[in-house]
């Protein structure tokens, strides 16, 4: 390679994530545990720790456009500024705003689709769960390449404005068959946990199968 490392010494494993993301969860049980109505069509919005992008404008537009059975859940993580900003949207019946939570896997199980930046970790976690994704506000470099990969193979979608993103969410929530197809494609393409494979290589000297 350009850095002088022989090609045969490089092993592509994928990004390691916790095994729980590769463990299928029950949507009905997760919704019951999280207090999410069983009949809702749920969009989960996660913006990463930096809270980049038009998160507040997108959340506002989605709450205005979602059908009666639609619901938006926003997880802000440790971004207190974003959390406080979203609370300014007021008490909207189709919006739930959370700060940090350890229940991200359960929220992914409960959701119908997820909006997120195409960062490596979040997208890998969602892909392992088979959760269809819509990407927002990609940053150049690795995020741009992630977006290109996912969209090229129809594993995720994106749009270039708040209005188009909101419309895309509503369109997908109204098409369960399309969401099932995307979910199945993700599960087929993200079967292996990079963390397990890395441990196998380090402890057993075994190369990852391709």
Could you describe each region identified by the protein language model?
Residues 1, 81-86, 122, 141-147:
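Short, glycine/polar-rich helix-capping loops at beta-to-alpha or helix-loop-helix junctions
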Residues 10, 94-96, 154-156:
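Short, conserved active-site loop motifs that form the nucleotide-linked donor/cofactor pocket
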Residues 1, 6-21:
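Donor nucleotide-sugar binding/catalytic pocket of nucleotide-sugar-dependent glycosyltransferases
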């Amino acid at each position: 390679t350009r850095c002088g490392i022989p090609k045969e010494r490089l092993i592509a494993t994928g990004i390691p994530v916790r095994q729980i993301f590769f463990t299928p969860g029950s949507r009905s049980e997760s919704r019951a545990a999280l207090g999410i109505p069983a009949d809702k069509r749920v969009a989960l919005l996660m913006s990463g720790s930096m809270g980049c992008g038009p998160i507040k404008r997108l959340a506002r537009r989605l709450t205005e456009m979602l059908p009666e059975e639609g619901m938006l859940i926003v997880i802000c993580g440790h971004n207190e500024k974003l959390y406080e900003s979203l609370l300014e949207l007021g008490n909207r019946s189709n919006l739930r705003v959370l700060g940090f939570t350890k229940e991200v896997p359960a929220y992914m199980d409960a959701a119908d689709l997820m909006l997120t930046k195409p960062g490596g970790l979040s997208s890998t976690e969602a892909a392992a769960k088979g959760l269809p994704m819509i990407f927002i506000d990609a940053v150049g470099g690795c995020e741009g390449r992630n977006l290109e990969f996912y969209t090229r193979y129809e594993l995720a979608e994106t749009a270039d404005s708040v209005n188009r993103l909101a419309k895309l969410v509503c369109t997908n929530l109204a098409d369960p068959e399309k969401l099932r197809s995307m979910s199945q494609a993700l599960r087929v393409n993200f079967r292996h946990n990079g963390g397990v494979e890395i441990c196998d290589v380090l402890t057993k000297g075994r190369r990852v199968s391709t």
